[in-house]
């Protein structure tokens, strides 16, 4: 699908250091996130692992501030980052989020949380530093092909084969819809990284977990509770704080 949405330039035009560094980070991120969700043993752990993964917008905001070379940029980014991160936790975790239960789950099953945290750092580093290595080349499509190979290899190496029964028309339709949304999202993100303002893009990335949670609840037919809307308000407030400080800098 990405070859349709974002056909890459000939690979010979890509800087070697970008292909190696960017490709390894992209694959590592996708693999770590996929494995972290797969290794979660309960619904509560899945939510908590997602929350750890959604630290990447905060890390991205702080990293882009750090490399901007603006005086006091990191310190000025912290207040908005804290407010927005609390908002993300409320929006994604909702009323079911329990700090005590989360600590217990981390203690009993630390690997998925470690993978999710590693993924958050990897993606923030990838988004911050690969644009300067790319020289305008967008390797998202190539990287995703490599991700597919790695994930299928992990799948078969774990002993799982192909599904016993083929999905119906509804399953294929859902698969196509997911492919379109994911490929479109990554294509837009890759274009924004190369041609947009990274500080603004980083701040805007706080909307990612909100849209993800909202779409999930709508697909499952679950009503969005008050914690979600409070979280949205906090994310908006934190983003505006970051934008205000960024423009003043």
Write out the residue ranges for each language-model feature.
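Specific transmembrane alpha-helical segments of multi-pass solute transporters/efflux pumps
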Residues: 7-46, 90, 178-196
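Cytoplasmic-side transmembrane-helix entry/capping segments in multi-pass membrane proteins
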Residues: 14-23, 72-85, 135-145, 200-203
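Hydrophobic transmembrane alpha-helices of multi-pass small-molecule transport proteins
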Residues: 21, 26, 73-96, 206, ...
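C-terminal transmembrane-helix exit sites in multi-pass transporters
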Residues: 2-9, 56-79, 210-230
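Hydrophobic/small/kink-forming positions within alpha-helical transmembrane segments
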Residues: 23-27, 31, 57-62, 89, ...
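Specific alpha-helical transmembrane segments that line the substrate/conduction pathway
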Residues: 35-71, 198-217
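Juxtamembrane helix-entry segments on the extracytoplasmic side of multipass membrane proteins
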Residues: 11-16, 93-120, 157-177, 223-233
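Transmembrane alpha-helical segments that form core, pore/gating elements
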Residues: 1-4, 57-62, 99-161, 188
